[in-house]
Amino acid sequence: MSKFILLVCILLLTTNIVSAASKCGRHGDSCVSSSDCCPGTWCHTYANRCQVRITEEELMKQREKILGRKGKDY
């Protein structure tokens, strides 16, 4: 009987951990303001979804990595 109660307690604990709500909205989650989103993301004004903010520096770094050349072509 004690093994059964222990198993039920572990099952309930696991269920609570899995179903616990996150404190901040991840990419694509609904939001009203940027404070609803996790750090590094912001709330898109029209879509009301958390969105990753990509800076020009990050974009150019990835472009250089993909194309193998620096600078803008335009």
Swiss-Prot record:
Residues 1-20 form the signal peptide. GO terms for molecular function: ion channel regulator activity; toxin activity. Highly expressed in brain. Is also found in hemolymph. Keywords: Antibiotic, Antimicrobial, Disulfide bond, Ion channel impairing toxin, Knottin, Signal, Toxin. Coiled coil: none annotated. One of its GO terms (biological process) is defense response to bacterium. It comes from the Eukaryota. The presence of a 'disulfide through disulfide knot' structurally defines this protein as a knottin. The impact of this protein on the neuronal activity of the honeybee brain is not known. It does not affect apparent movement or hatching of blowfly larvae. However, when injected into fish, it induces a strong reversible paralytic effect. In addition, the presence of this small peptide in the hemolymph of adult drones together with its induction after bacterial infection suggests that this peptide exhibits antibacterial activity. This peptide may act by inhibiting ion channels. This is Omega-conotoxin-like protein 1. It comes from Apis mellifera (Honeybee).
